[in-house]
UniProtKB/Swiss-Prot annotation:
Gene3D superfamilies: HUPs, Isoleucyl-tRNA Synthetase, Domain 1, Methionyl-tRNA synthetase, Zn-domain. The keyword Nucleotide-binding applies. It is found in: Cytoplasm. Its main location: cytoplasm. This is Methionine--tRNA ligase.
Amino acid sequence: MQNRKKILTTCAFPYANGSLHIGHILEHIQADIWVRFNRMIGNEIYFICADDSHGTPIMIKAKKNKISPEKMVFLFYKEHKNDLSKFNISYDNYYLTHSKENYRFCKLIYKLLKRKKLIFSKYISQFYDCKINMFLSDRLIQGKCPECNSEKQYSDNCNICGANYCSTDVINPISILSKSVPIIKKSKHLFFDLPKFEKFLKKWIHSGVLKKENLRKVSEWFKNGLKPWDISRDAPYFGFKIPNEKEKYFYVWLDAPIGYLSTFKNLCDKKEKIFFSEFWDVNSKSEIYQFIGKDVIYFHSLFWPAILHGINLKKPTKLFVHGHVTLNGEKMSKSNGFVIKAKTYLKYCDSDFLRYYFSMKISSCAKDIDFSLSDFMNKVNSNIINKIVNLASRSSSFIDKYFEGYLSYKIENYELYCKFTSLKEKINKYFQSNNISFIIYEIIKLAELANQYFNKKSPWKLTEESKDKRNKLHEISSMGINMFYIIMIYLKPILPNLSKKTEDFLNISLKWENINKPLLYPHLINKFKPLCNRITKSQINYIKRESTIK
């Protein structure tokens, strides 16, 4: 067994102003697979997330729905937590940023940064809506991105190219609230002095924390020099008030990443023998891994590590960056309803199936992943049902009928068995590097090999009463069970539902350290029951109908 690591893993926080869709779920599945594997090999790992619970969109939606922002945030928090649990996302703590702990951390960090002269104030030009007499924060303005010219972008950052810019730089601005053209008015804001961290950040991003493709993107932001970061917003705003400032609030992108600290502290307070300093102390030997989408890499690779460095806390060990999920080749959009909600999917399909389909496409690169319902159905039925589960069904039918559930005394084809077990280190590396699609490729090759073996041996021809044939039948069927057993050990972090049913069926836990130990007599398996069902066209049609997808 390797040296036991201490690891903290986080996902970027879902925003508490709407239901989750399958695009959101990708990141949580990706991280959960990585976490489950690390638990499986014996690492001490904690997995946390929270709802991002502040900001203008929440304030606006709550007002529109005639509900308080606090109540709306809590309702979505409960919904998100429930959806994620049904996808078997195994968080040790799922919290929200609108919490006492997070406000305490925000005030403390602000105080520390200010003491180090890393916070300064200055008057800025800001959009102001004369029709409703209020300053307009970033999410209340839409216009054309000044970097890539994409239309309908918010005035703080672009969802298309990822650029972060001054709100008044947006082209052809329009107020979302009144649909009028805003004027520019002066307002005092507070800034975090990001340029002071340029030397540190250049070194940090080259420390192995980012993949080369992400590194190239982040490096571009240094070309024109880093700019101070506006960490304040004018009232009205739903968030935390800034101490000793009138009508000023912490910008959501300041308090949201601080939520990584407060959510973990909340876990430490609830559980014994988990110590905050063991993970966040600057000299800690623990490791911190963060799973994020490519659209928030700017905040996680520049602002957040700079703040951690400014307050002398540990920086992330690695950022795993993923792409977006497209639907039939098109970008999903909440505004026009072109999404598959998490709860709609769960109503009709096993959560394992989405975990599997995404796993076929997850790699360490930040490429977009396309979701096609027809391809989803075909791949799940072909690979999980026909190739993997069917292997268990075919093998167990003979074990149950002729041998009362007992497996044979020996492995029928030891060379083939070793082909299955010899992939252990390769698959270990793929899990650790987050190249899950490579694992699926290897596993499907194994499943095909197992079924070819079974077909070639034709055990159904060996059911006669002769002792030699019965022994051979026993060994071949037990070989099929052992190949299925190894496949399912490899798949355990990916398919928790199927793994639990497999453990019940095989009468043994699926443990990484047992891969090289075959199941032999007197091991007894239980009578086979269907482990999962095929996806039908009617299920797909129901999802399409409820998601208004053609």
